[in-house]
Amino acid sequence: MEVEVKAKQAKAAARRMAVLDENTKNLALNHMADALIKDIGKILEANKKDVVEAEKRNIKASLIDRLKLDEKRVEAMAKGLREISALPDPVGSIEKMWKRPNGLQIGKMRVPIGVIGIIYESRPNVTADAAGLCLKSGNAVILRGGSDAINSNIAISSILAKAAYETGIPEGAIQLIENTDREEVNRMMKLNGLIDLIIPRGGASLIKNVIENSTVPVIETGVGNCHIFVDETAKFNMAKDIIVNAKVQRPGVCNAVETVLVHKSIAKEFLPLMVEELTSLGVEIRGCQITKEICPQVKEATDKDWETEYLDLILAVKVVDGIEEALDHISKYSTGHSESIITENYENAMMFLKSVDSAAVYVNASTRFTDGGEFGFGAEIGISTQKMHARGPMGLEELTTYKYVILGSGQIRK
């Protein structure tokens, strides 16, 4: 079985990864970045095969956008690796140290998790991000991308692994499962003792499948039914610009807005401005009854729209009585990813920040900033929507755990 063989190789590599010095890891990351640029033609050629195949299968445009690479995106992948190399290495750092009355010194040391399995869909840039972050945090990684991006992933992972091994990274530390049979994923999720953690990145069905079937511990990531609430004191131009950015810039990503809630006192003035701007940009609006009365051209929303992560140029719009109804709606339908309030009212802003139970909560800013790079973490492994171990964009520190180190001078317990 391919996955079991590679998991054993990764497990062996993980022991050596844990003790690598920072200079070796940084050298490898920069060499990997150089290799991506050097072999950019090979990557784009492989990616073209994936895109052509996706177009033949009539995959929607927003998903093809996630799959497609160009020189700029490959350069961004290389830049991400260099940025990771410049970040402080968390491995081996002592978070705190205290001394007991018997003279024992006890501390918490950051250590790698071990072998991390990444299961993801049609975004080949994840291959580079995951390999880079796992390497810098001292972990071995097993990558299992979607079949849509198999040619791209093989090209990228082989280039990265070769470059890493040339600079002293143990062989087996970067593995890609090339078999696209879903049964390989099922096997991967049962490899307790070989794989220490699985992180799924993709749509709701993928994440649900991993959570329900994995016996290996899982960090749940990023289904993003994200909301923006336009409060009655909002500046219209600011609100419109934020909503356009959050919906239109990249509609197929998890931090794009899916539902806009508008305070009833400004709905008659604000909604026509917002709807006109969005429809001119190709966005389909699905509105509540009040929204439809104000803007008859919009489609009528159903209850299903409030719970849908469209990942497309579609936006649900609802008029609410005020912040309390907005908070109730978000509490009911949010996936815990990212929510924003547009307001000039300090009390409402603070209420929103305290009340919304999501990984990232904004005041007067686009939800599109929920991203490891934008948060200053470098590339991210994913955006956790759970509360245990990691929450929000997961950078280097979130890919480590800790152990207690105890320094003595002959103490015995009495």
From Swiss-Prot:
EC class of the enzyme, as a word: oxidoreductase
Protein localization: Cytoplasm
GO biological-process terms attached to the record: L-proline biosynthetic process
Catalytic activity, as annotated: L-glutamate 5-semialdehyde + phosphate + NADP(+) = L-glutamyl 5-phosphate + NADPH + H(+)
Entry-linked CDD domains: ALDH_F18-19_ProA-GPR (cd07079)
UniProt xrefs under NCBIfam families: PRK00197.1, proA
Entry's family note: Belongs to the gamma-glutamyl phosphate reductase family.
Protein's name according to its UniProt entry: Gamma-glutamyl phosphate reductase
Organism, scientific name: Thermoanaerobacter pseudethanolicus (strain ATCC 33223 / 39E)
